[in-house]
Amino acid sequence: MDCRLYRKGLIVCVAFLSQHLGYAQNGPNWRDSLTAINKQIAESAWSTDLHLRKAAYNMELKQWQYAVDEYALVLRREPRNPAALFYRAYANTHLRRFDLSRNDLNDLLAIVPTHFEARLSLSVVLQQLGRKQEALDMLNQTIQLHQDSAVAYAARANLERQLKQDEVALYDWQRAEQLAPRDPTYVVSHVDLLLVLGRHREAQRVLDAAVKRGIPRGMLAEWYEKTKHQK
């Protein structure tokens, strides 16, 4: 686990933080659910909830275009529907339509300016579009609005590392650790950067502090070994 996971996986993580389905199913069960909800839609008057649920099933089955089409139906009737804007942006990222994702996320933020997941998602989309400074500006604003979010600091640290702003990235990893002291992900990302910079003793101190905070030493064993080999 290192900070590169944020760039690759952040959209996936934040998109399902507020997922309107609260239970787990396997593929065949999702298909059964999709069949059932299609029947409900065919037999019922218009229901935004039914169409949002259908789109969610499409996404669980990785039917991204079907999901996009379903959210479009909702947005024709309710252009300011936050869930439809957010999840259509998410589906479009899987289709690599990053401009469309950006448009939906900007529209959502015009409606809900503090929407945390939308802000993080937009920062990732901007990076995919090669607009890293805009992405950094978005993360700076997000941290101002959500100063107690370890995830926001970690996302900014990852981008700062890509931009070779290593010292400020180290600060942000430290803040992420302070806000989520028992999360090993932030620890190993912090240590990984220290090792890249050749600061092996400092990396070991970070590991020792994490163990004192209650993170099992075994979870960090690989990183302890790396500090030994690189001294």
Residue ranges and their predicted role:
Residues 21-65, 69:
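N-terminal leader/linker segments that initiate helical-solenoid repeat arrays
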